Design a protein with these regions (language model features):
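Positively charged n-region of N-terminal signal peptides that target proteins for export
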Residues: 1-5
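Bacterial N-terminal signal peptides
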Residues: 8-18
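Metalloprotease/metallohydrolase-associated module, dominated by Zn2+-dependent proteases
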Residues: 38-110, 114, 121, 162-232
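Mid-length scaffold segments of soluble, non-membrane domains
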Residues: 105-106, 111-161
Length: 232
């Protein structure tokens, strides 16, 4: 029996500040929403590409950030999710007594998406800051895409060695999901540090050259990992 995963991975929330800060405020730090906390009705988004101001369609900031509206140029919601073609199989083993079920992952890959209806663009942003803010959010999107590609590479190695044997199909699925959550959690901890480092390097002060360095770095990494993406 072949099955699809009905599971999103996680949601990244990142923003661009208006003014320089001596220290990155707590509200401005990139956040991750874990698997079980993501709303079931979250709108679909689009996979990695160049962003435009028109991609930010949320009418307002989330309630927890509304009081900081004047300090935020842009707010981006990006998500890493399991691809639609990811699937696993559960087969009944007749040679064993009592009868049990074997679960294996046939294909597992991840993709990054930007969610326009949850992403906000400050209508009062200064014209001189539009390019900088858009580039900043583009880099966050790129970091999320790179994390998705790394998860896909790691998943290939991990999934090929995974076999789950349980008494019922439901138990098999639950065990597979539990293993999957562990894989995702480890990846999140590493990538969260990278998003935070980027914000600390570029949000505490206005530095086009430093942000351009980050853009060059992630662009090169995207080129180097493109073949792995196509192999999803």
């Amino acid at each position: 029996m072949r099955n699809r995963f009905f599971l999103y991975a996680f949601l990244w929330l990142a923003l661009t500040l208006v003014a320089a800060c001596a220290q990155l405020p707590e509200y401005a730090k990139p956040r991750t929403i874990q698997i079980d906390q993501i709303p079931k009705d979250i709108p679909s988004g689009f996979t990695y590409r160049q962003l435009t101001p028109e991609d930010f369609r949320a009418p307002s900031l989330p309630e927890n950030l509304s009081t900081h509206r004047e300090n935020i140029n842009a707010y981006t919601a990006t998500q890493i999710r399991i691809t639609a073609d990811s699937n696993f199989s559960i087969t009944r083993r007749f040679l064993e007594d009592p009868i049990d079920y074997l679960g294996r992952i046939n294909h597992l890959a991840f993709e990054a998406v930007m969610i326009p209806n949850h992403s906000w663009w400050n209508p009062k942003i200064k014209a001189a800051m539009v390019g900088y803010a858009l580039q900043h959010e583009q880099i966050h999107f790129a970091l999320t895409e790179l994390a998705a590609r790394k998860l896909t590479r790691d998943a290939r190695k991990w999934a090929s060695n995974l076999s789950v044997i349980k008494e019922t199909p439901q138990q098999v699925y639950a065990e597979i999901v539990q293993h999957l959550k562990g894989l995702i959690k480890s990846a999140m901890e590493a990538n969260q540090k990278r998003h935070l480092k980027f914000d600390e390097d570029t949000s505490l002060f206005y530095s086009p050259s430093w942000q351009a360095w980050w853009l060059e770095m992630v662009t090169e990494e995207l080129k180097q990992t493109e073949s792995g993406k196509l192999g999803r």
